[in-house]
Amino acid sequence: MANPKNTASLEELKARFEQAQSTLLTEYRGLSVAETTELRRALGSDVTYSVAKNTMIKLAAREAGIELDESLLTGPTAIAFVNGEAVDAAKAMKDFGKDHKNFVIKGGYMDGATIDAAQVEAIAELDNRETTLAKLAGAMQGSLAKAAGLFNAPASQVARLAAALQEKKEQ
């Protein structure tokens, strides 16, 4: 008969896998409790970071319909369940790793696929959703301003512009 404590832990991990938008796995060997707490703060409230046995992680992931690469489940493993921006979590982990040489990003699971440490590092280099949307809005605003200027121009300027474009095409 299964240990009730292990069964409860397994169910909790399974629920976290099912609810998380992505997961990131790390090796925490050599980190103090204070350093782990510092990492949790850096990850923010959208990320649950916890230590678990590799066999429990493997079983919970499988029960949640996720197949993790076996190479991610070696050594002491901590897992970050990301319910917000994976980019922000990856950046926080990468920055934390710069100051704490014992901290190792193993990889994770995102968008239905296992990712390795190099892919997590690449994700950390991306802009987050808010920044990307702001850049897109800025680009669109510039284009819209040009279009508005064109629509507000007198008809003679529009005709000259059309003629210039026609000449350019003919050349």
Swiss-Prot record:
GO terms for biological process: translation. GO terms for molecular function: large ribosomal subunit rRNA binding. It holds the Pfam family Ribosomal_L10. SUPFAM superfamilies: Ribosomal protein L10-like. Keywords: Ribonucleoprotein, Ribosomal protein, RNA-binding, rRNA-binding. GO terms for cellular component: ribonucleoprotein complex; ribosome. InterPro entries: Ribosomal_uL10 (IPR001790), Ribosomal_uL10-like_sf (IPR043141), Ribosomal_uL10_bac (IPR022973), Ribosomal_uL10_bac_type (IPR047865). HAMAP family: Ribosomal_uL10. Part of the ribosomal stalk of the 50S ribosomal subunit. The N-terminus interacts with L11 and the large rRNA to form the base of the stalk. The C-terminus forms an elongated spine to which L12 dimers bind in a sequential fashion forming a multimeric L10(L12)X complex. Forms part of the ribosomal stalk, playing a central role in the interaction of the ribosome with GTP-bound translation factors. Belongs to the universal ribosomal protein uL10 family. PANTHER family: 39S RIBOSOMAL PROTEIN L10, MITOCHONDRIAL. This is Large ribosomal subunit protein uL10. The lineage of its organism: Bacteria, Bacillati, Actinomycetota, Actinomycetes, Mycobacteriales. The gene is rplJ.
